[in-house]
Amino acid sequence: MGLSASSPAATAQSAAEPSKQHQVASPPSECPMHQEKMRGCPMHMKASDRRAENTDDVPAHQERAYEYVACPVKSGASQVNDDIDPSNMMPPPNQLPSPDQPFPLSTVREESSIPRAHSDKKWVYPSEQMFWNAMLRKGWRWKDDDITSEDMTNIIKIHNQNNEQAWKEILKWEALHAMECPCGPSLMRFGGKAKEYSPRARIRSWMGYELPFDRHDWIVDRCGKEVRYVIDYYDGGAVDKNYQFTILDVRPAFDSLSAVWDRMKVAWWRWTS
């Protein structure tokens, strides 16, 4: 789940990008369309001093992310100055075009459906420009590939859909704890571990299956309890109309007896169903 920082203000051209992308983003909390008071779960609504204690869990880029979420009646965004990003082990990218960038990219960001821990907001996905800058920082060079602005639009859609799919799979596991956490889980932080193959992935490879092309670990807040989920990403072939091509293997890590018991139960249900 690549989420990134933002820096300069989005231009009127950037604000018009959603129609070009055929992508409707949820209005930000400050948008006039969002006047209804949000209702939060009492178990997630922390006191102000508790939130202050958990500021290190919140990525710097998420604090101002809603300034780049498209609002139907508001365009532009104020300047953002983020210095650190403590939650995803990456320096914060920005919304500035790279020096030799061949075409303009949208700086509009889409709100996800994933609740952010210790907050009444959702996680916000990176813009096309942020994703481009992140790939450059990791060593990618656009001149080596035949890539267009439309390709970047599709890459963002695939990226966002993969994360939505991953969260839905996590919610299936969390349904086992609905009595324990009736308000539902929220995402605290995450990290990519593409070359740190899980034991399950290695065992599958020994059996002749391909290794995953990526791995993420997501840390979920289950009403005050931290739960780590391992997500292995496998190539599923052609991209469908919903921008899904990845097969996800999502399960709680063996960090506790509760997680072990959950996986034993689910394995038994799958075996006997």
UniProtKB/Swiss-Prot annotation:
Pfam families: Cyto_heme_lyase. GO terms for cellular component: mitochondrial inner membrane; mitochondrion. Its main location: mitochondrion. GO terms for molecular function: holocytochrome-c synthase activity; metal ion binding. Keywords: Heme, Iron, Lyase, Membrane, Metal-binding, Mitochondrion, Mitochondrion inner membrane, Repeat. Signal peptide: none annotated. HRM repeats lie at residues 30-35, 40-45. PROSITE patterns: CYTO_HEME_LYASE_1, CYTO_HEME_LYASE_2. It catalyses: holo-[cytochrome c] = apo-[cytochrome c] + heme b. Residues 1-39 are annotated as: Disordered. It is found in: Mitochondrion inner membrane. Its EC number is 4.4.1.17. Residues 1-18 have a biased composition (Low complexity). Coiled coil: none annotated. InterPro entries: Holocyt_c/c1_synthase (IPR000511). Belongs to the cytochrome c-type heme lyase family. Lyase that catalyzes the covalent linking of the heme group to the cytochrome C apoprotein to produce the mature functional cytochrome. PANTHER family: CYTOCHROME C1 HEME LYASE, HOLOCYTOCHROME C-TYPE SYNTHASE. This is Holocytochrome c-type synthase. It comes from Gallus gallus. The lineage of its organism: Eukaryota, Metazoa, Chordata, Craniata, Vertebrata.
